A protein has these predicted regions:
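N-terminal, charged low-complexity regulatory/assembly segments
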Residues: 1-65
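Generic detection of intrinsically disordered/low-complexity segments and helix-coil linkers/edges
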Residues: 4, 22-23, 130, 163, ...
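Amphipathic interaction/junction segments at domain boundaries or subunit interfaces
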Residues: 53, 64-153, 157
């Protein structure tokens, strides 16, 4: 499997902080990730996109780091990996939105991406409340990030992925408003997403 940002960041942590154990930690990470992938091999292609890119490498890194540090520290380190990618994403999107008028298209892009990448085939259950006229408002009732983290006994890890949305989309443009007051990963019964033109 090709390297993900999570596996790269994990290997960097292992090499820098635990050089004498890095080989063993990498082997454990690889074996755990391989097992997680095998256990989820029957998932749909759409769900595999999320599992392979973020969820399963995140779980493998989190579990592996707990072999050499307390659980809370391992959680903060994996959160840092996800946060770093989100900050990069935010910077790239904000730069793109310097193109005059482009910000107006963002809610409609969110509608399309929700339907194609974050739909039922991928394990999500989006309820569209308001789409069009510069507004994307969706309640996500089910999420494979939350479900998979919970299934593997680490529901607290899901908050890293929830936080990445807020980091990526808050303050992208003066005329765009990102709102979310609830997430499944933070213990609520839904994620109430909203991106709208001011």
């Amino acid at each position: 499997m090709k390297e993900t940002y999570l596996s790269r960041d994990f290997r960097e942590t292992a090499a820098q902080r635990f050089p004498s154990q890095a080989k063993e930690l990498n082997a454990f990470f690889d074996a755990r990730l391989h097992a997680l992938l095998a256990e989820n091999a029957e998932a749909s292609k759409e769900k595999q996109y999320h599992l392979k890119r973020q969820i399963l490498p995140g779980i493998a890194a989190y579990e592996t780091l707990q072999r050499v540090m307390p659980k809370e520290e391992a959680l903060q380190i994996v959160h840092g990996y996800v946060e770093r990618l989100a900050r990069t994403s935010h910077k790239q999107l904000a730069t793109l939105l310097l193109i005059p008028g482009l910000y107006r298209l963002v809610p409609s892009v969110f509608v399309k991406s929700t339907r194609s990448v974050f739909g039922p085939a991928a394990g999500f259950d989006p309820k569209e409340l308001q789409v069009g006229n510069g507004i994307w408002r969706v309640d996500m009732m089910k999420c494979p990030y939350h479900d998979t983290c919970t299934e593997y006994g680490c529901p607290e890890l899901c908050r890293s992925f929830c936080d990445s949305d807020d980091i990526s989309y808050t303050g992208l443009h003066p005329k765009l408003i990102w709102e979310r007051s609830m997430t499944l990963g933070r213990g609520n019964d839904r994620c109430d997403f909203c991106m709208k033109v001011r």
